[in-house]
């Protein structure tokens, strides 16, 4: 497993080359997007790259870092300090991003160094002021103006699905109580406006009245008055 501390320890004027043998694959690629940029392949060539640090640098170290990782990749964001042999009294600070690609055996198959050029410019006083206060704002202004001159761009408006859902939401009315018999009652109305429910109520009333006993002759009214079933 690749340890972050092993990578940090390589950035010194006296690197431990055993850490390279431990973490790097034999056919690993090393690519630097620096000034100058270069690319090598093979673990022996990578040995020489880290041995060369002591040739051009009096001192180098990673002062701050953070990283993200997955099963196949590590992205190491570092802040480094370096003192060159030709300028032993001047310390340069710069940012370097290191991309580490691993295989299934947790060996490094590709190692990339990407130096942030803006962090290098910050170490040069006059260039620092001119770049961050004149050149960079001017380029931002030109990009904004270029966008305003693009007449061919058309805004497609809101998303069609979103607009449809909003219309449905506006037209939706929640009905709290549902009377399931209401449609049936409406359909069963005849031309006189009488429903089957009304007929049933009338039949119940006649049946109730028919069960009353005539006090005079003791007979049941149900035999004297037939029920009207056709109203």
Swiss-Prot record:
Alphabetical list of InterPro entries matching this protein: NTF2-like_dom_sf
A Pfam match: NTF2_SigF
**Which SUPFAM superfamilies does this chain map to?**
NTF2-like
Which GO annotations describe the biological process of this protein? hyperosmotic response
Induction context? Induced by srfA, during development. Down-regulated in grlA null-cells at 16 hours of starvation.
Q: What is this protein called?
A: SrfA-induced gene F protein
Native species of this protein? Dictyostelium discoideum
